Structures are given as structure tokens and as C-alpha cells.
Amino acid sequence: MIDFFLKSEYLPAGDQPKAIKEIENSILLGNKYQTLKGVTGSGKTFTIANIIKDLNRPALVVSHNKTLAAQLYREFKDFFPNNAVEYFVSYYDYYQPESYVPSKDLFIEKEATINTEIEIKRIRTVTSLAKRRDVIVVATVSSIYALGSPDFFKKSAREFFVGQKISIKEISDIFVELYYERTLMNLERDKFSIKGDIVEIWPSSEHGEFAYRICLDFDEIVEIYRVSSFSKKKLGATNSFTLFAKSYFVIPYENVLEAIPKISHDLSLQCQYFKDNGRLVEAERLKQRVEYDLEMLRETGFCSGIENYSKYLSGSTMERPYCLFDFFPKDYLLFVDESHVTLPQFRGMYNGDHSRKLNLVNFGFRLPAALENRPLKYDEFEALINQVVFVSATPGVEENEKSSVVVDQIIRPTGLVDPEIITRRSDGQMEDLYSEIQKRVALKERVLITTLTKKMSEDLTEYLVNLGVRAKYLHSELDTLERVEVISLLRKSEIDVIVGINLLREGLDIPEVSLVAILDADKVGFLRSTTSLIQTIGRAARNSNGLVIMYYDKISLAMREAIEETNRRRQIQIDYNEKNNITPKTIVKKIQNILEKELNNKNKNVGYDFEKIISDERLSKKKLIDKLKFDLEEAVNDERFEDAIVLRDKIKELSSKISIARNKKREV
């Protein structure tokens, strides 16, 4: 078994060694629940990485949104370069679920746009879990949604090796059995090609980097190469490779045949139920829809909406559907990041899904079995937990009550202390805020301002810009790339102030920010709860000059609790620094994007070079632009937005050069 190897220039420091030891001891004692209560900037991710390395177990790290999941994914990829670090989030760019609105007698067909790159990562996740133990998966709430049987997926594995006695036809039959399609055109993902004694296949779990080329001689594999999926350049020889089904929804055809009579039986029962209750329209509707699906299953082994028949097709006797948790070995570790937000998400998924599908069943659009294609109920999720570490700066009641140990991680390795908090009356707040911004700008530091509404953030930004402040607003109506560009501008000192709403809470890591201003800090509500205020205060905790100003009319209970907790932590940190003669230092975080190194590696692997690309006549320019677009899509899906911006600009530059070259040829 391959061990987890943690790569880092640093050793655990501050409260990290204590936290690592206490949590590991609790886990080794067999306790199911533990909580890491770590302040912002205390290195909670590094603590998790050390626990995974020391206990040497597969791990699932769950976050509450794609952006933070991608952040964690990148960090764990850096920490564990020699191990399998995977990313499992929803693969829908757009999703309109099948639904029925009785009040309008309106049936809405399912519509979805699937993000190919995220789908690849999901397949790669289950493939890694089927092949090895040294796996870390970073996921979102998608981890509790229905998947296919892990046993069926593992049994789909087929190995190909040099010296294997096998014919081209046998290889082709295996590929088809694993849901791959043959192509006579250019090789694409999920397809294979046959040319003479050479077979090439592009596995579904590969990110477009390479395909496999199998060379045969008289029904024997003599060579296997990895080749670039785009340039077909050889990347290296290998003695063998294992291929899994192209989808994690693996359904053996015998299961389809066994399911058909069961579906027919339940159809008869449900139609009779409708007729007995005088609902002939629903009975006829259900009969027509299900009989059409049955005909498709008989003919092709597949039908539209096949997931609604997963109860029959999976062969499972469980009352719940399979999900990502079932692909893990029994001794895996679960880490719930920002648990105060993530756990309520897990708790709420089932009810919304169930009420929508119940309408479909009650009005004859689906059989009752469709209700079993669903996210897990909360108690089902809890039953699948082996051992868990809740991770949050502000853990909720559930985490505190269930955990055998709640470990504080207050001391930061950098010596940074929680920011000082000043409260000021809201009278004259605009003039006061402008004055504070000027002080920070003079020191070449940055400012975050949080408001309650989008309109307020836009109006305040306009007000500041009119005063000559370099400011931009940040809220959910900006698309992902636009939001990242705004943050990038702040970090690069091209603007000094960001005005936002809820986007300034968990996970926004900008060490240049020394002032966080909270307007309407006393207003009662989600955005000004104790937890939200503490999280917002944490945005100023990565700078040695960190300061938070709360503007208020009347100090609220949430304000008082947030201030008391922050001051408690701050005093502990100051005392520790004085005792150990530590001078706090602002975190230095590189502004440049991580694309440069990755592109250098990709240039070596896939055969293109930005500097030589125009003059290289051996390669198709269109194919090279397609490759860059592929990388751009991958960067966006990985939430590597600064990388995506560089790639986007490079595509524009390259397209422009090609256009100029074409025009010159026309002139000649």
C-alpha cells in the first residue's frame, strides 16, 4: 500500500501540534465525532493534512460550495503530490429538474447542461477509490446524491498488459461492454479507434492529457504507449493499464432483464391504485410513460430518465441509494469543513428533492420507486460516517454536543493575532469610513466593506469612486471570473477597496486587507449573526495591522458575543507571543498565478509552446487553439480563475496572430 507523503516546507507550529495530537488520539480511541475549532489563518488545512498523513487512511473532505472545495483541492494537491487527490462536485452548469406544478397543470421536462471537465473529475474520483487507498477526495453536498453500485463499478475493471494474448475483436468487445464507442474520425474522450494492428482509447477519467495506444502482433499485445490526445505524440511506454467503465452508473444487462418484470408489476399496481380512486387520467399517463421506457430498456438497455428506475436496476436490498460514501473503505476519515454551514446543507437536501418528486408520483408521471433516486436523509448520512472531524472557526451546537473532543487552534504559526475591534455610531459613518480608507491607502493596505444589500454595495461603491477612491463592488450578480478579477485587482493594488455582502465571509483570503468595515453591524439577521460577524472579522486576521470597525445604532447581542469571543482569542494570542518573544508578521502570499509552472509541464507533455506556436507548421493551429480552450474550461471548472484569465488572453492573442497571418497570405 502506498503511504500518504506530505510535502511541505514547514513543520506544524503554533497550536497545530497540540491540535493534531489531540484529534489523532481521539480518533485512535475509536471516538466517532471530534471538532477542530480553529481561527482564521491558523492553518486548519495543514492540520487536516498532517492527521491524514499520520493516520494513513483514505479521506473525504466536504465543503459547502464549489469555490472553497476547489481551494481545498488545490491545497491538498500541493501537500500530497504523490497521492491521489480528487475533486467531486456537481457536474451541472445548468439544471432544471423534472417537475409538475398541479396548480397550473404544468409538467416541466428535465433540462441539464453537463460540465464535461467536472464529469471527468467525478469519474476519476471513483476510479481512484476503486484502484487504491491513498486517496483524498474534496467534495461538496454532491457526495450524498445517488450514484451507481460501487461493486458493479469495481467489477468493470479490465487490465491490458504487454504479452497478453488477445485479439483486436476481443479488445473491441471489452471496450463496448464498458460503454465506450468506436469512432472512425478523430479520437475523442470516451471513444476508441482501430487502425490496422493499433487500437487507441481515450479513457473517460483522463483530463484530455493522454490516450492509450495498444500495438498488437498476431493477437498479442507487444507495446502499450501513452500518447497525447491532441498531437498523438508518444509520452512514454507502459507495461500495463487498467480500464474502468466510462460511467459510475454501471448496469449489467442481466440486471436490466431482471428489472423489467419488477417494473411491469409495480406499474400494474400503481395503475390499479389510480383507477380504484377514479383517477383515470393519471393511470393512463403512467401506463404510457412507463411502457415506453420498458420498450427502450428491452431494445437498448437504456431509457431517458433511467435514474428513476435505479431501485430496480441496482440489485441493492438497501433502503437508501448508493452514494460517494459507499466507494470508500470502511476505515475512511471524514472532514467537514466550515461545518457550521455544511451540516445544515446536508440536513436540508432530502426534503426539497422529496416534495418535488412526490408530485411526479402522485400525478402519474413516475412510479413510486422514483422517490428512491434521491440525496441521503440526514440520519442515513450519519450512519455512513466512520469517524469525522468537524472543522470551523465557529462550530454550531451539533458539533459541540456530539464531539468527544473540541480542540481549539487559536495560536497562528505566523504569530498574527485576531484584529482589534472598534465600535462606532452610524451617525457620520460615511465621512468616518472615508477617513479610515485614506489612512489605509497611505500605508498601501487594502479595505473590505460589508453591507446588507446589493443596492447598498453598488451605491456605496459609486459614492467612494466619486470621492476618488479606487473601489469596486463584489456580489453574486457578477459571474465567477468577474468576481475573481475584482479580488485580483485588489491584491495587485490596482484598487484599494472592495464593497460586498455575504461574499466577504468564509474562505476569502486576502492578506493585504488590514481594515474590515461592517456597516449596520447591529441589524438582526443571518448576515449579522454571531457566527457571521466572527467569520467577517476573520477577514482582517491575516494582516499584522488588522482592524475591524463596526458601525451601529445600538449594540446587539450578536455584536457583543462576537466581540467577546474575538477579544478572548486575541488576548490568548498576545500572551503567547509575549511569552515566546514572537513578533506578528503579515502573511506573504504570492500574487502570481500558478499557471506558469503547469503550462511549462503541459508544453512538454502535449507538444505545444506559446513562443513557437505560430511558426510551427507541423501542428494544426485550430487544434492548438482548441487545446487552449479545453485548458481554459478546465481552469474555470477547477476554480483556477487567474489561470483562466491568462489562458483566455492567450487564446485571443493567438487567434489574432493567426488572423493577421491569414490576411497577409490573402494580400500576397
Swiss-Prot record:
The organism's place on the tree of life at top rank: Bacteria
GO BP, sorted A to Z: nucleotide-excision repair; SOS response
InterPro entries membership: Helicase/UvrB_N, Helicase_ATP-bd, Helicase_C-like, P-loop_NTPase, UVR_dom, UvrB, UvrB_inter, UvrB_YAD/RRR_dom
Annotated GO MF terms: ATP binding; ATP hydrolysis activity; DNA binding; excinuclease ABC activity; helicase activity
Subunit text: Forms a heterotetramer with UvrA during the search for lesions. Interacts with UvrC in an incision complex.
Family: Belongs to the UvrB family.
Name of this chain's protein: UvrABC system protein B
Organism in which the protein naturally occurs: Borreliella burgdorferi (strain ZS7) (Borrelia burgdorferi)
Gene: uvrB
